[in-house]
Swiss-Prot record:
The gene is adk. This is Adenylate kinase. Monomer. It is an enzyme of class 2 (transferase). It comes from Streptococcus pneumoniae serotype 2 (strain D39 / NCTC 7466). AMP binds at residues 31, 36, 57-59, 86-89, 93, 156, 167. ATP binds at residues 10-15, 128, 137-138, 195.
Length: 212
């Protein structure tokens, strides 16, 4: 099986990806792992990527696309199939992936799209607070401290509602054209993500069992 998994930050994509890999024995290909492996193995694209990262610059699409192609060309993919996680991030990368798969003679069989209401994600992602003295982490809604006094806690910039909302808005704007592109090919399977982790996986399992 050759799959993509998509979903907004906080939708539980990482958790479900791990469950899919364990149950269906496909190769889990995450963007971070790909970059680290390519740089460690000093592949042509890995060396190029490192040169940008060392300068503190963004890695251009053609290098990212090249790293993906290197990984998808490896022998284990032919044997196990793959679950691609964190790529493509833009419609341009989606078109590049289509081209890569066509060149390698690989067929994409399904996109698992975990859907969670953005307002729920905003609450989930922006609720983290940290105790100023102990450094303990809590969540305003899901794991509130017993003795909550606002002045005793702080939030990291990344966790503040306005920062989280910006991140979600960017992800929505980038993700919608990708979903539309693959939906037109009949590949997208929407999964309700606002339920228990095991129920989410049960829904995914039904979809993937029918794909086999």
């Amino acid at each position: 099986m050759n799959l993509l998994i998509m979903g907004l930050p906080g939708a539980g994509k990482g958790t479900q990806a791990a469950k899919i890999v364990e149950q269906f024995h496909v190769a889990h290909i995450s963007t971070g792992d790909m970059f680290r492996a390519a740089m460690a193995n000093q592949t042509e694209m890995g060396v190029l990527a490192k040169s940008y990262i060392d300068k503190g610059e963004l890695v251009p699409d053609e290098v990212t696309n090249g790293i993906v192609k290197e990984r998808l060309s490896q022998d284990d993919i032919k044997e196990t199939g793959f679950l691609l996680d964190g790529y493509p991030r833009t419609i341009e990368q989606a078109h590049a992936l289509d081209k890569t798969l066509a060149e390698l003679g690989i067929e994409l069989e399904g996109i698992i799209n975990i859907e969670v209401n953005p307002d729920s994600l905003l609450e989930r992602l922006s609720g983290r607070i940290i105790h100023r003295v102990t450094g303990e982490t809590f969540h305003k809604v899901f794991n509130p401290p017993v003795d909550y006094k606002e002045e005793d806690y702080y939030q990291r910039e990344d966790d503040k509602p306005e920062t989280v909302k910006r991140r979600l808005d960017v992800n929505i704007a980038q993700g919608e054209p990708i979903i539309a592109h693959y939906r037109a090919k009949g590949l997208v399977h929407d999964i309700e993500g606002n339920q228990d982790i095991n129920d989410v996986f049960s829904d995914i399992e039904k979809v993937l069992t029918n794909l086999k």
